Each structure stands twice: as C-alpha cells, then as structure tokens.
A protein has these predicted regions:
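C-terminal beta-signal and adjacent terminal beta-strands/loops
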Residues: 59-69, 88-134
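Asparagine-centered polar/low-complexity signal
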Residues: 5, 34-37, 73, 84, ...
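Gram-negative outer-membrane beta-barrel transporters
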Residues: 1-68, 129-133
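Residues that define the transmembrane beta-barrel architecture of outer-membrane proteins
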Residues: 32-36, 79-83, 122-126
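Outer-membrane beta-barrel transmembrane domain signature
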Residues: 61, 72-82
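Flexible, surface-exposed loop regions and adjacent strand-edge segments
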Residues: 18-26, 70-75, 113-120
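Short amphipathic alpha-helix initiation/capping segments at coil-to-helix junctions
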Residues: 76-80, 87, 119
Length: 134
C-alpha cells in the first residue's frame, strides 16, 4: 500500500490586537506553507518470508518563521525532509514492528520563537511496537 498527502497552508495574519499593519499577510509562526508525506508498506504473503514486511517513507516541510512580524532578527527555520523505514512481522493476531525514524540522522529544527528558544528535531531513533488484535 502507498499513502501520500500534501498540504498547502496559507495561515496569514489578517488582524492584530494593536492594528499594526506591519504583520498583515505574514505566515503564522511555526507554520510551514507546504507539508508532504509519503509512506509505502508491503507485507509478504507467501514463501519463506511469509508475514514479514517492510515500509519506507518520508515527510517534508517548507521553511517556517519563528516569530511574527517583519523584524530584522526574525528567525527562519529551513525546510527539511526526513527518511523513515519500518520492518514488520505478523503472526495471527500479533504484530511486531520496528520503526527507524530519521534514518539519515538529519539535524533539523521543528520550530521555535527566536535564537534562544529553538526546538531541535529528534535524531535517528528506533521504536519497537508489539500489537495484539482482539
């Protein structure tokens, strides 16, 4: 199976508490204009590797502004793309899964407000999940 999605978000400021026009039309802080995700998953149905599966995907976002306004020191967080993968094994109602996120160990920023309050993204990581369906 393949799942993909794209979102275009024009989250612009249309009104301010002080009616300051300098912020009108600016993209809301920490809101990417573009976001894209794709995930593909395949589970082997026959043969020696019966019930094993794998997945591969990526998620990407465009640049984001750290604060509102046309300020000289406005922080711009660059866009990024992350590559993710997974391995699966199903046995009747039980599934064991390993997810490998940010497999290229990319350094990126998920958002923030200014140079002192910026939030780094997660480094390469592995998650294990066991699921039992009743």
């Amino acid at each position: 199976s393949i799942v993909a999605n794209y979102a275009y978000t024009h989250a612009a400021i249309t009104k301010t508490a002080t009616d300051s026009e300098k912020d009108f039309g600016m993209q809301r802080p920490n809101t990417p204009r573009n976001a894209f995700n794709i995930w593909s998953k395949y589970i082997i149905e026959t043969g020696v590797l019966h019930n094993f599966g794998f997945g591969l995907g990526m998620n990407a976002v465009s640049k984001r502004y750290g604060q509102v306004g046309r300020r000289a020191n406005t922080v711009v967080y660059p866009g990024y793309g992350l590559l993710n993968a997974a391995l699966y094994y199903r046995l009747h109602k039980l599934q064991v899964q390993l997810n490998f996120d940010n497999i290229m160990n990319k350094i990126y920023w998920v958002g923030g407000y200014d140079k002192l309050r910026s939030f780094p993204g997660a480094p390469r990581n592995i998650k294990a999940t066991v699921t039992y369906r009743f």
